[in-house]
Curated annotation (Swiss-Prot):
Recorded family membership: Belongs to the GSKIP family.
Location, primary (coarse class): cytoplasm
UniProt protein name: GSK3-beta interaction protein
Gene this protein is translated from: GSKIP
GO molecular function: kinase regulator activity; protein kinase A binding
Places the protein is found: Cytoplasm
One GO biological process term: regulation of Wnt signaling pathway
A GO-annotated cellular component: cytoplasm
InterPro entries to which the protein is assigned, alphabetical: GSKIP (IPR037395), GSKIP_dom (IPR007967), GSKIP_dom_sf (IPR023231)
Entry keywords, A to Z: Cytoplasm
Length: 139
C-alpha cells in the first residue's frame, strides 16, 4: 500500500495506542470487493464454463461485478456487494437498472438457482471429497 509520508514521519507519530488500535480496526473492517470477487471466482470456477471479475465495469470498496457463463451457456453479470450477489444483466459487462433480482447470501445459492449443471458438478465434487476423506480416515 502506498503512503504519503516517509518512514521518518511514521516514527514521530504521537497518536495514542488506543487511537492506533481503533484506526487499525477500522482499516481491517473495510472490504475490497475486487478481492472478494476474486475469491468467489476461485471458489466455484470449476463448476461453471467461465467466470471472471469484470475489467469493464467499475470495482470499488463496496461493489464489484463478476461475469458468469454457466454450463448451459447462460451469460450473466453479477453484482457483489455487502448485501450479497445478484444478477444485474443477462450478458457480460452490462447492468440493467430495470432488473430487480433478489440478492443471494452466497455464490452457491445464486448458482444453484441459475444452473442445474452447477448443482450436479458441485454435488459430484462434494461427494468425491467426502469419499476421499473416508478413504483417508480408513487408512
Amino acid at each position: 500500500m502506498e503512503t504519503d509520508c516517509s518512514p521518518m514521519e511514521l516514527t514521530n507519530n504521537t497518536e495514542s495506542e488506543e487511537d492506533s488500535d481503533y484506526r487499525d480496526f477500522e482499516e481491517a473492517d473495510v472490504k475490497d470487493m475486487r478481492l472478494e470477487a476474486e475469491a468467489v471466482v476461485n471458489d466455484v470456477l470449476f463448476a461453471v464454463s467461465n467466470m471472471f471479475v469484470s475489467k469493464t465495469l467499475p470495482c470499488a470498496e463496496d461493489v464489484a461485478y463478476i461475469n458468469v457463463e454457466t454450463r448451459e451457456r447462460g451469460r450473466y453479470c453479477v453484482e457483489l456487494t455487502d448485501s450479497g450477489l445478484r444478477v444485474v444483466a443477462y450478458d457480460f459487462d452490462q447492468t440493467d437498472d430495470s432488473l430487480q433480482n433478489p440478492y443471494h447470501e452466497t455464490v452457491y445459492s445464486l448458482l444453484d438457482t441459475l444452473s442445474p449443471a452447477y448443482r450436479e458438478v458441485f454435488g459430484n465434487a462434494l461427494l468425491q471429497r467426502l469419499e476421499a476423506l473416508k478413504r483417508d480416515s480408513q487408512s
